[in-house]
């Protein structure tokens, strides 16, 4: 491994550890000093006092395969030995990577060298394969979901190879399914919601402890538990996870996970102190008027290990664009969770124009406002009024900025802001529901958003992701489970029960219809289809079965709208605002734990 490789690899983790260490020492040295509560982003170190550096060492070499044996990795991926680039990224070396890299340099010069044979001799596919399962067509969808949790469950990774790309986790967890045989950050929140309704609270706690472990090791929650995901995160739902567990186990959970909440916040705000107006650094952006908001980012500017060939080809097809800039933006697209969507494209239609790092997204900033509020609550429960008030001020300042900067009068909805061109992107997406979900929107804005969503995004099968049919998976005509849930909860919070129920029941029909025809629940659905339950397309890989967050959201919606459980056919599921008590639900769908809406206040 070369020194430049180590240097590039270590930048994120070294910086995060140094920031955390600085914050920790600042808390010890200046515990009695006044706190900047202006909310403008200054004094982040002071605001998140008592943050110790990450306390756990990584049990594996936390270096992605493309940096451990770069020449071999590139050659294998570009030779297209495997249909899916992720296959080689997940293969386990049988000996130290440095030895394999040296052996490759010697072997490839020999006559009759076979790259495929070399890979077979030196790597093995992961043994953590999916459990054999054939769905029972006579089983109702609730029982199917409750059965699938065990199929998608993975036990603690006690025997992981030190050379594997897998980052071992100490507790059991749920994977999404199919090619995704590792934990994913934002997927897991929606999985946890469903687990609660299935009476699997202990597993929900295990999931939370796994994410806390990742923060304690690496200073942040990576995209997933793979070395090649360490350079980025995903939409920050950790605070929501803490709240979900606290609803069952009490407010002591906030104090228990306060150190990890602090580190999560430090990761997203790193680089904000002293950032000049009109500049961006890592995840933070200070607008020309001094407003501090956040963006998605990735520390590396190279092809993604899991989509290596695709990224190289995209760069080759776009020679006029700097490849490093393109690759960083493709990686940042992975951090958005919306990989990919016309939402992120400079021209609104072409992947090669992806420009995530120029955009201040509404969803990310709403989640960070919720994180700030959660930190404030944790501080108050600890009796730390000064820091609680500081975080409350930060949350209020951010919420005001969202209502002011990210409100698009042209769309009559919330949108994203291009801080480079100093203008809104004017692209309507389902992310407009995030300010409702987190309680950031004003009541008038929420009412306007509801009308816009009903008019522009509501489809026969649920809520469409965007209005653009680009061929990308996070665009029309596709609908995704998490966005349906966020919309339903947000609309319910702002007294829009009819639209919330319409979205929920249409989505339930789509899921149940597909399940009745195939015995499966899948990653995404075509919500434009005249016939409910048509599978979706688009994306860099085939449609995935399983599927973690689809199962979780459906399980919750069947509890929130119990009248849908009794329908024997999708066509029998009622639509509209009719109220039906939970007692009307069948025993199979009765909630094991009552899911409460967020405690976040609603703006006037």
Where are these regions (language model features)?
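N-terminal signal peptide c-region/cleavage motif recognized by signal peptidases
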Residues: 24-28
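Intrinsically disordered, low-structural-confidence terminal and linker regions
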Residues: 30-107
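Terminal, non-catalytic domain-edge segments
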Residues: 34-47, 547-587, 592-597, 602-604
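Extended glycan-interaction surfaces of carbohydrate-active proteins
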Residues: 72-182, 206-212, 218-221, 225, ...
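Extended, well-ordered alpha-helical scaffold segments
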Residues: 144, 200-211, 252-269, 371, ...
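Alpha-helical support elements that line or immediately flank enzyme active sites
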Residues: 184-211, 431-443, 484-497
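Aromatic/His-enriched, Gly/Pro-containing loop or helix-boundary segments
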Residues: 215-257
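Long, repeat-rich segments with strong aromatic
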Residues: 355-384, 391, 476-486, 490-494, ...
């Amino acid at each position: 491994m070369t020194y430049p490789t180590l240097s590039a690899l270590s930048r994120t983790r070294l910086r995060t550890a140094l920031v955390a260490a600085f914050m920790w020492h600042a808390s010890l040295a200046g515990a009695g000093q006044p706190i900047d509560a202006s909310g403008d982003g200054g004094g982040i170190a002071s605001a998140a006092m008592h943050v110790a550096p990450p306390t756990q060492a990584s049990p594996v070499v936390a270096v992605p395969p493309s940096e451990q044996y770069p020449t071999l990795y590139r050659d294998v991926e570009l030779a297209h030995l495997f249909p899916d680039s992720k296959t080689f990224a997940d293969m386990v070396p049988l000996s130290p990577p440095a030895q394999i890299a040296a052996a490759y340099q010697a072997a490839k010069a020999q006559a009759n060298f076979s790259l495929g044979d070399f890979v077979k001799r030196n790597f093995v596919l992961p043994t953590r394969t999916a459990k054999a399962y054939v769905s029972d067509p006579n089983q109702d969808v609730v029982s199917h979901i409750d059965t699938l949790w065990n199929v998608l469950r993975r036990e603690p990774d006690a025997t992981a190879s030190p050379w594997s790309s897998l980052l071992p986790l100490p507790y059991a967890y749920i994977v999404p399914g199919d090619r995704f045989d590792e934990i994913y950050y934002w997927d897991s929140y929606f999985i946890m919601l469903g687990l609660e309704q299935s009476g699997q609270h202990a597993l929900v706690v295990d999931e939370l402890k796994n994410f806390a472990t990742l923060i304690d090791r690496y200073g942040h929650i990576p995209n997933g538990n793979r070395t090649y995901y360490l350079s980025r995160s995903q939409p920050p739902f950790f605070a929501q996870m803490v709240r979900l567990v606290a609803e069952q186990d009490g407010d002591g959970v906030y104090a228990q996970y306060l150190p990890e909440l602090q580190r999560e916040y430090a990761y997203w705000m790193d680089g904000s102190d002293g950032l000049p107006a009109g500049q961006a650094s890592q995840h933070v952006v200070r607008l020309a008027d001094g407003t501090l908001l956040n963006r998605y980012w990735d520390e590396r500017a190279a092809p993604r290990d899991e989509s290596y060939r695709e990224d190289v080809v995209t760069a080759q097809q776009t020679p006029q664009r700097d490849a490093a800039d393109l690759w960083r933006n493709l990686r940042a697209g992975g951090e958005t969770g919306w990989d990919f969507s016309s939402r992120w494209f400079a021209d609104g239609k072409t992947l090669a124009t992806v420009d995530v790092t120029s955009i201040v997204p509404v969803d990310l900033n709403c989640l960070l406002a919720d994180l700030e509020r959660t930190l404030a609550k944790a501080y108050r429960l600890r009796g730390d009024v000064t820091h609680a008030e500081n975080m409350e001020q930060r949350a209020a300042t951010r919420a005001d900025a969202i209502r002011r900067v990210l409100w698009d009068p042209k769309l009559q909805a919330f949108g994203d802001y291009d801080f480079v061109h100093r203008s809104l992107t004017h692209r309507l997406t389902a992310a407009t529901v995030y300010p409702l979900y987190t309680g950031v929107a004003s009541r008038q804005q929420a009412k306007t958003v509801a009308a816009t969503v009903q008019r522009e995004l509501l489809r026969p099968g649920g809520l469409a992701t965007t209005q653009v049919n680009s061929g990308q998976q996070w665009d029309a005509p596709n609908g995704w489970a998490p966005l349906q849930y966020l919309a339903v909860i947000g609309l319910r919070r702002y007294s829009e029960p009819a639209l919330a129920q319409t979205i929920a029941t249409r989505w339930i029909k789509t899921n149940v219809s597909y399940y009745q025809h195939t015995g499966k629940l899948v990653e995404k659905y075509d919500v434009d289809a005249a016939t409910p339950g048509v599978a979706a397309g688009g994306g860099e890989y085939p449609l995935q079965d399983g599927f973690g967050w689809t199962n979780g959201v459906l399980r919750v919606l069947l509890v929130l709208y119990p009248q849908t459980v009794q329908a024997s056919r999708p066509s029998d599921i009622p639509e509209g605002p009719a109220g039906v008590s939970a007692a009307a639900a069948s025993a199979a769908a009765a909630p094991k734990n009552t899911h409460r809406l967020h405690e976040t206040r609603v703006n006037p």
